[in-house]
């Protein structure tokens, strides 16, 4: 009995371990069937094979490795393996290799800046609140959530002030892009997160400028200078517009 498979527009197929019958999940039966299937797929000129293995079916992974399947990516309950069948160079897309994060530069009506210090990490000085995106979030949603989680301040994102790109993050072969957003505060009461935040405060520019180099980075001072230029320009800057592309909702960012 052949595998249940789905095809894609690029000449590839996907097999999911959850679709295997109990008999097909037996290691000997699976090993025999995957060998036969690879021969059949080559005759059919299938290009790439995607095998999605649920964690409860992980006993079949060695059989796939023995037949040339490579690890593509993993999630908490699933491992995806691939095999390229033609003799030509593999053109299967690689998995996501860049992390996204966002933070907020929040200035209140008294021109005080919302800053915080973390409980742990390589840098324990003052910084703008922010962190990594959760799945499904856009940039502004991440910045809004992170500012609130770390400081208790609710905000509305107005524009992207800047972003920085790192070719290497804490994970091997994974980059990092971090967006700093201009945020409008909806409240000023502080409720720091006890697990993440050592301290958060509304700081005056005089207080910020008085900190030693160990407690404030040149980056933060430069961003405050950039914020001042953005505010004095009266322009919207890099702002977002919701739109629909090919049936998918997305955010477009325009610099005006």
Task: Write out the residue ranges for each language-model feature.
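N-terminal strand-loop-strand
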Residues: 85-128, 155, 159-162
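Active-site-adjacent beta-strand/loop module that shapes the phosphate/pyrophosphate-binding cleft
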Residues: 108, 166-190, 205, 222-231
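Conserved GNAT acetyl-CoA-binding A-motif
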Residues: 42-53
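Acidic, metal-coordinating catalytic segment for phosphate/diphosphate chemistry
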Residues: 60-103
């Amino acid at each position: 009995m052949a595998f249940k498979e789905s095809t894609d527009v690029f000449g590839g197929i996907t097999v999911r371990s959850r679709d295997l019958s109990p008999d097909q999940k037996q290691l000997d039966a699976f090993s025999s069937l995957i060998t036969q299937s690879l021969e059949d797929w080559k005759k059919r000129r299938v290009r790439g094979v995607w095998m999605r293995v649920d964690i409860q079916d992980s006993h079949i992974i060695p059989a796939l490795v023995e037949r040339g399947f490579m690890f593509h990516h993993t999630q908490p309950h699933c491992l995806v393996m691939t095999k390229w069948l033609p003799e030509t160079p593999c053109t299967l897309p690689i998995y996501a290799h860049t992390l996204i994060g966002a933070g907020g530069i929040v200035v209140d009506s008294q021109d005080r800046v919302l800053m915080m210090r973390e409980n742990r990490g390589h840098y324990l000085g003052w910084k703008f609140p922010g962190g990594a995106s959760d799945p499904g979030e856009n940039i502004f949603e991440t910045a809004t959530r992170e500012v609130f989680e770390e400081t208790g301040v609710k905000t509305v994102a107005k524009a992207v002030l800047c972003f920085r790109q790192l070719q290497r993050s804490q994970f091997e072969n994974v980059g990092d892009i971090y967006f700093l957003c201009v945020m409008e505060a909806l409240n000023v009461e502080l409720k720091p997160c006890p697990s993440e935040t050592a301290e958060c405060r509304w700081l005056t520019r005089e207080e910020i400028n008085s900190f030693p180099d160990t407690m404030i980075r040149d980056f933060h001072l430069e961003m405050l200078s950039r914020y001042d230029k953005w505010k004095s320009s009266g322009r919207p800057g890099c702002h977002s517009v919701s739109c629909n592309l090919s049936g998918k909702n997305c955010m477009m960012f325009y610099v005006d």
